[in-house]
């Protein structure tokens, strides 16, 4: 009997996402329930955004939750390497095979030509797609241009009519028309693969038998299915999990809810409570109990109990469940968990340099640095009264800063400063005009340790969470203001 093998393949491009933990949990439970294996693979082909620091954060966050894997970059295994950036020669081999078989072709189209084609198609109200310009180039021309070092990509061929039947373990057969599919790029100009080629090659070579992934990938499933067909490989069974959603039913995003696992760790949530809550996202125990352990979830796991309705990730419900876990701990367990959270040596070392020069005894630390250890901070509207800005302008500045910070890919002091500086300059203000608003929003006080250093230490999600709280206290933005301010945001450089 074939051993069940599942995997999670996150990209190390930022803080580890609760959506990654959610999909990892269900893959882990499915594998363990069937006596199988769970693999961690790192999809780091986006060399501009991928970092080893983010990769380490993924390991730390999943292990904090109690999710362990049998094979991966850090633990090894018989199917390595487990980082896609280290498998380039493998993808090149299979990409060349597709070209040789006539299932893919070399494309020399420039970005400028592709943009022009898309613009023409959109003007005709057509779905933008590649027009096949390079699909039938003579072989000698292709070889000549390759020998000349001309920039190129490899694209797969796809049918233009009919439907692809996608067998989904949750929905049954799903029919998707081929005319919705573009001629997908498989190998980029930098020699690295796109998600589609790397995904299929890796899943096959690593013996993955079942793929549980988010339903946002369902519309592009025909491309993956066609690649398996082109290679002549057996396709894993597919399961498209419902997406986590905000309370307003929109897709879970950092603009409306904190999404990083690190945020919930910093806020003092218990890992077993967060894992329990993620387990309840679209799934339920046979007896409908709300509180259960990972071992209990594995024991009773059955995909037939997954609901296709978009599960709502509600911070209030998570907090309620976390409270249930806390109250059922012994006093000794509770004290140990508090100590582990409050006296985290790594976190304290980040804070200490900013506090040491401002205190004369240790009892002064709590009032000065308490905001580093809380979720929200006590907010006083009077602290946002500004000598130069009226209340509407105050809200506008905070909203614009929040939006700019939401688009920040790397959370570093210099980049945070750059975002705030860009907003100030665009509004013809000085940085010193904006900073008095940042102090109360982030620290709850009119003055404190460097607020920019504090934001770097607190992290992206917690900093943005506090800015949202400050905006809500001051009345937020009306629909009309939001539209007007979005135009201003889009005009701000950077």
Swiss-Prot record:
Enzyme Commission designation: 6.1.1.17
Cofactor binding note of this UniProt entry: Binds 1 zinc ion per subunit.
GO cellular component: cytosol
Catalyzed reactions per annotation: tRNA(Glu) + L-glutamate + ATP = L-glutamyl-tRNA(Glu) + AMP + diphosphate
Keyword list, A-Z: Aminoacyl-tRNA synthetase, ATP-binding, Cytoplasm, Ligase, Metal-binding, Nucleotide-binding, Protein biosynthesis, Zinc
InterPro entries for the chain: aa-tRNA-synth_I_cd-bd, aa-tRNA-synth_I_codon-bd_sub2, aa-tRNA-synth_I_CS, aa_tRNA-synth_I_cd-bd_sf, Glu-tRNA-ligase_bac/mito, Glu/Gln-tRNA-synth, Glu/Gln-tRNA-synth_Ib_cat-dom, GluQ/Sye
Binding site for Zn(2+): 107, 109, 134, 136
Main location: cytoplasm
Motif ('HIGH' region): 10-20
Origin superkingdom: Bacteria
Biological process (GO), any one: glutamyl-tRNA aminoacylation
Function: Catalyzes the attachment of glutamate to tRNA(Glu) in a two-step reaction: glutamate is first activated by ATP to form Glu-AMP and then transferred to the acceptor end of tRNA(Glu).
The name this protein goes by in its record: Glutamate--tRNA ligase
Organism: Pseudomonas aeruginosa (strain ATCC 15692 / DSM 22644 / CIP 104116 / JCM 14847 / LMG 12228 / 1C / PRS 101 / PAO1)
């Amino acid at each position: 009997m074939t051993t069940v093998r599942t995997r999670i393949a996150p990209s190390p491009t930022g803080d580890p996402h609760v959506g990654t933990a959610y999909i990892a949990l269900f893959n882990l439970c499915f594998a363990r329930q069937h006596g199988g294996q769970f693999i961690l693979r790192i999809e780091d082909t986006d060399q501009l955004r991928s970092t080893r620091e983010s990769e380490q954060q993924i390991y730390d966050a999943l292990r904090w939750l109690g999710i362990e894997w049998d094979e991966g970059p850090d633990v090894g295994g018989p199917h390595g390497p487990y980082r896609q950036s280290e498998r380039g020669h493998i993808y090149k081999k299979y990409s060349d095979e597709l070209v040789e078989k006539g299932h893919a072709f070399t494309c020399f189209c420039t970005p400028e030509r592709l943009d022009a084609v898309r613009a023409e198609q959109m003007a005709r109200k057509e779905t933008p797609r590649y027009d096949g310009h390079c699909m039938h180039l003579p072989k000698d021309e292709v070889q000549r241009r390759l020998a000349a070092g001309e920039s190129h990509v490899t694209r797969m061929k796809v049918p233009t009519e009919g439907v692809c039947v996608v067998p989904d373990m949750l929905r049954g057969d799903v029919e998707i028309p081929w005319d919705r599919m573009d001629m997908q790029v498989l190998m980029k100009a930098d020699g690295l693969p796109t998600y589609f080629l790397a995904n299929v090659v890796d899943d096959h070579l690593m013996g993955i038998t079942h793929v549980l992934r988010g339903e946002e990938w369902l519309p592009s499933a025909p491309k993956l299915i066609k690649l398996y067909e082109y290679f002549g490989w057996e396709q894993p069974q597919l399961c498209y999990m419902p997406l986590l959603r905000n309370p307003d039913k929109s897709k879970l995003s950092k603009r409306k809810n904190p999404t990083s696992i690190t945020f919930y760790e910093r806020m003092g949530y218990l890992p077993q409570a967060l894992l329990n809550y993620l387990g309840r996202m679209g799934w339920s125990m046979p007896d409908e109990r709300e509180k259960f352990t990972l071992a209990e979830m594995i024991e009773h796991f059955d995909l037939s109990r997954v609901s296709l309705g978009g599960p709502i990730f509600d911070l209030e419900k998570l907090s309620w469940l976390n409270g249930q876990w806390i109250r059922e701990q012994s006093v000794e367990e509770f004290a140990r968990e508090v100590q582990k959270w409050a006296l985290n040596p790594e976190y304290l070392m980040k804070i200490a340099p900013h506090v040491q020069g401002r205190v004369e005894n240790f009892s002064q630390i709590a009032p000065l640095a308490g905001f580093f250890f809380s979720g929200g901070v006590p907010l006083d509207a009077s602290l946002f009264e500004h000598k130069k800005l009226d209340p509407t302008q105050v809200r506008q500045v905070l909203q614009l800063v929040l939006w700019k910070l939401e688009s920040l890919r790397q959370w570093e002091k210099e980049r945070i400063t750059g975002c705030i500086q860009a907003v100030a300059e665009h509004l013809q203000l000085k940085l010193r005009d904006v900073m008095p608003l940042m102090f109360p929003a982030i620290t709850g006080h009119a003055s404190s340790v460097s607020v920019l250093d504090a934001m770097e230490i607190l992290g992206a999600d917690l900093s943005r969470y506090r800015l949202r709280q400050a905006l809500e206290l001051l009345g937020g933005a009306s629909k009309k203001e939001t539209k007007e301010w979005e135009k201003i945001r889009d005009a701000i450089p950077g």
